[in-house]
């Protein structure tokens, strides 16, 4: 089996995490997984949604979008169509769920964190890149809140989280699929994990033929290997 990119089965794409990419948001990152590029920002606002008022905890919510020409052909802006598509809603809910799992909301205070992930160039794995980059932006936003005198209840961060795609391509488990592989893969999994080794979410779909338990185990093992490398890259970015 030869991957279109020339990578071996357990090899990630080149990953870059650039912090403080924009000047206004409390946390901002440009994350690059190969040719996939996503700008992730975290904005801090006082107050919480109505359903959380008086409960003594904060909130985090996420939005996701793609520039019209982030793909090979221009896509119409969802705003011009008057509503978000099902894929967009699914992805932004995944991003929000994943990042909330990293936080103890009771220590956040009366604050809402708005996470925005905007894909400027897509080559597969946009949702996993978004989660990975937004986690670093979230860390920077928490540091800003603390500097402003917040987080008096302690650090709300329970652990880091990251995400990566794995799949079955030409009968073999492969790590971090690009668009060409994703389009031809027999199975595609998106895996979200904590730095402590726990799973937050596993999304999997077979195309054409079911995948077997041994395939699933092989893909999870690859995801765990890749995730360990990604956590190291996140920590290196935060240390700069």
From Swiss-Prot:
Q: Which SUPFAM superfamilies match?
A: Ribonuclease PH domain 2-like (SSF55666), Ribosomal protein S5 domain 2-like (SSF54211)
EC code: 2.7.7.56
Q: Which GO terms describe its biological process?
A: rRNA catabolic process; rRNA processing; tRNA processing
Binding residues for phosphate, per the UniProt record?
A: 87, 125-127
Describe the reaction catalysed, as an equation.
tRNA(n+1) + phosphate = tRNA(n) + a ribonucleoside 5'-diphosphate
Q: Which UniProt keywords apply?
A: Nucleotidyltransferase, RNA-binding, rRNA processing, Transferase, tRNA processing, tRNA-binding
Q: Name one GO molecular function term.
A: tRNA nucleotidyltransferase activity
Pfam families, A to Z = RNase_PH, RNase_PH_C
Which Gene3D superfamilies does this one have?
A: GHMP Kinase, N-terminal domain
InterPro entries named among the record's database cross-references: ExoRNase_PH_dom1, ExoRNase_PH_dom2, ExoRNase_PH_dom2_sf, PNPase/RNase_PH_dom_sf, Ribosomal_Su5_D2-typ_SF, RNase_PH, RNase_PH_bac-type, RNase_PH_CS
Q: Which family does it belong to?
A: Belongs to the RNase PH family.
Q: What does this protein do?
A: Phosphorolytic 3'-5' exoribonuclease that plays an important role in tRNA 3'-end maturation. Removes nucleotide residues following the 3'-CCA terminus of tRNAs; can also add nucleotides to the ends of RNA molecules by using nucleoside diphosphates as substrates, but this may not be physiologically important. Probably plays a role in initiation of 16S rRNA degradation (leading to ribosome degradation) during starvation.
**Subunit and partners:** Homohexameric ring arranged as a trimer of dimers.
Q: What is the name attached to this protein's record? A: Ribonuclease PH
Species the sequence originates in: Pseudomonas putida (strain ATCC 47054 / DSM 6125 / CFBP 8728 / NCIMB 11950 / KT2440)
Q: What is the lineage of its organism?
A: Bacteria, Pseudomonadati, Pseudomonadota, Gammaproteobacteria, Pseudomonadales
Q: Which gene encodes it?
A: rph
């Amino acid at each position: 089996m030869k991957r279109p990119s020339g990578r071996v089965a357990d090899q990630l794409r080149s990953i870059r995490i650039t912090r403080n990419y924009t000047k206004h948001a409390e946390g901002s990152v440009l994350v690059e997984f190969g040719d996939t590029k996503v700008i992730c920002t975290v904005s801090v606002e006082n107050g919480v949604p109505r359903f959380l008022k008086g409960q003594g905890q904060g909130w985090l919510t996420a939005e996701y979008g793609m520039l019209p020409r982030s793909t090979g052909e221009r896509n119409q802006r969802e705003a011009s169509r008057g509503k978000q598509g099902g894929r967009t809603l699914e992805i932004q809910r995944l991003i929000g769920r994943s990042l909330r799992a990293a936080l103890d909301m009771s220590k956040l205070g009366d604050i809402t964190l708005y996470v925005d992930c905007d894909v400027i160039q897509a080559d597969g794995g946009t949702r996993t890149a978004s989660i990975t980059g937004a986690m670093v932006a979230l860390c920077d936003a928490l540091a800003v809140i603390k500097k402003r005198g917040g987080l008096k209840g302690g650090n709300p961060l329970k652990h880091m989280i990251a995400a990566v795609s794995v799949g079955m391509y030409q009968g073999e488990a492969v790590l971090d699929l690009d668009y060409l592989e994703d389009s031809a893969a027999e199975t595609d999994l998106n895996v979200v994990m904590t730095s402590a080794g726990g799973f937050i979410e596993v999304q999997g779909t077979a195309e054409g033929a079911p995948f077997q338990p041994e395939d699933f185990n092989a893909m999870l093992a690859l995801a765990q290997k890749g995730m360990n490398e990604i956590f190291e890259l996140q920590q290196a970015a935060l240390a700069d």
